[in-house]
Amino acid sequence: MHLQALTGLATLAVTAASQTLWSRDVDYKALSKELSASAKVYFPGTEDFDAASKRWSNLDKPTVNIVAVPATENDVVEITLDLTQANTLRQVKFANKKNLPFLAQNSAHGAITTLGQMKQGIEIYLNQLSGVKIAKDGKSVTILGGTASKKVTMGLWEAGKQTVTGCCECVGYVGPALGGGHGWLQGRHGLIADQFESMNIVLANGTLATVDENSELWWALKGAGHNFGIVTSVTSKTYDAKIKNWAFASLTFKGEKVEELYETINKYILKNGTQPTDLINWSYWFNIPDLDPTGPIVQILLMQEGVDVVDKAYTGPFQELKPLAVDAKKGVYTDLAKWVGVTTEDGPCQKNGAMNPRFPIYLQDYNPAAQKKAFNYFADNIRGDSIFNGSLVTFDGYSTEGVKAIDSKSTAFAYRNQNILVGPLLSYQSNGTATDEKASEIGHKVRDILHEGTGRDTVPVYVNYAFGDEGPKEWYGSEAWRQSRLQELKEAYDPKGMFSFYAPIA
């Protein structure tokens, strides 16, 4: 799905009982001596440790012996980049010397099962590496590695600026960008990663490097960046916020209309991959018992830039299908997250102990028959008192003009030609392995049905939503040249595979 508060990769907690699993030959407290006075180290059994290592999804979570927190000055003071990045650097060196696994964590919303391969290691918690500094000429912004998307959005907005960020407020800015990164403004400017001008990154050898378009690593960092280091800051393009107003419309239908609804989206919204730049279309499948107690509904969401009411050319065809409920709002760009339910206060941003595996797939357009088949299967498994009744399927239909304007070979992100990002999300409180296996079965089946409807051989997967069993060809593109280039760069920059817990290249 979508999500903010910091940035990097991911990690999690261990209980008091797991303290017995610690490597007895490692003096973890020695790490404190390696850091500045304002840095922090958290140990199991403390509230700080529990809070810092808590995850959005508890399925196949990593286990952590210690949490190290790089220091910064407080958020209202200009952050000294050299100091904060040096702290991260020392932690990497400590882990290297002790031969310990480590993960950098942002908001901990990564749900990929490969994270569970991180055992008894160090979490580098980036929440203090948070800050936004706009350049004097207003054309770029430097963002520290642990900065939340909301902080970036609001900091720029107050200065009359914008850049492409993730949609969900509780997700970090950098983390999604390392996998490409979708956002509201991508129709105008491209992916989040397309905004990068340079970045500072701690590499596997413990050195801090400044990387830009002149580095061979630049290509890989924009799409497969989780595999190459810890980003401590990034400088990105900014744009004047010339158009401030947005309009929103939601139309909710009984599931029996699913086939007609997606035919309508194909005809009036997608338009064979030419969706208007100022228009965004999402849709959800989920339970709203007050509207339909018999099963999940289909909710169509339309967001349009530069108007106070969504054009009837887009809402009219849906109105003709007689929705159960309709809502309309007007506001500004910063209202979008609230309208679609992904603010820091909304459900997708809460860490409540649930399992939240996702099973993403990209689509060119909708196969209405496949949509109906997938919906019916999903509905049969989440309706009523099912343990999975809090699950949903999301369909993100951003404008893609800005994404497609960039050469597909210029970055490691492989799916610029795709128009729809689908994110089946099985959300539940696990009561055992059998339940986890059933959730996996449901999620995979929904994806399989949609994939069969495309007639394609390969399954294109958004790496930031990945379940974990797909593989490099699905995450990073099946072309042989892409796989070869990534493997060569991995061998050159991380031959020991130190950054291989999130969707590893090899």
UniProtKB/Swiss-Prot annotation:
Q: Which pairs of Cys residues are joined through disulfide bonds in the record?
A: none
In the UniProt record, the signal sequence range is 1-17
EC code(s) of this entry: 1.-.-.-
Location of the FAD-binding PCMH-type domain: 59-241
Names of required cofactors: FAD
Q: In which pathway does it act?
A: Pigment biosynthesis
Top-rank lineage group of the source organism: Eukaryota
- Name the family the entry cites: Belongs to the oxygen-dependent FAD-linked oxidoreductase family.
**What is a GO molecular function of this protein?**
oxidoreductase activity
Q: Which UniProt keywords apply?
A: FAD, Flavoprotein, Glycoprotein, Oxidoreductase, Signal
Q: Entry's InterPro entries?
A: BBE (IPR012951), FAD-bd_PCMH (IPR016166), FAD-bd_PCMH-like_sf (IPR036318), FAD-bd_PCMH_sub2 (IPR016169), FAD-linked_Oxidoreductase (IPR050416), Oxid_FAD_bind_N (IPR006094)
Instruction: Enumerate the glycosylated residues.
Output: N205, N272, N281, N389, N431
Keyword Flavoprotein present in the record's keywords: the answer is yes
Q: What is this protein called?
A: FAD-linked oxidoreductase chry5
Query: What function is annotated for this protein?
Result: FAD-linked oxidoreductase; part of the gene cluster that mediates the biosynthesis of the yellow pigment chrysogine. Pyruvic acid and anthranilic acid are likely substrates for the nonribosomal peptide synthetase chry1/NRPS14, with pyruvic acid adenylated by the first A domain and anthranilic acid by the second. If pyruvic acid and anthranilic acid are merged and released from chry1/NRPS14 by hydrolysis, a subsequent amidation would lead to 2-pyruvoylaminobenzamide. This process is probably catalyzed by the amidotransferase chry2 using glutamine as amino donor.
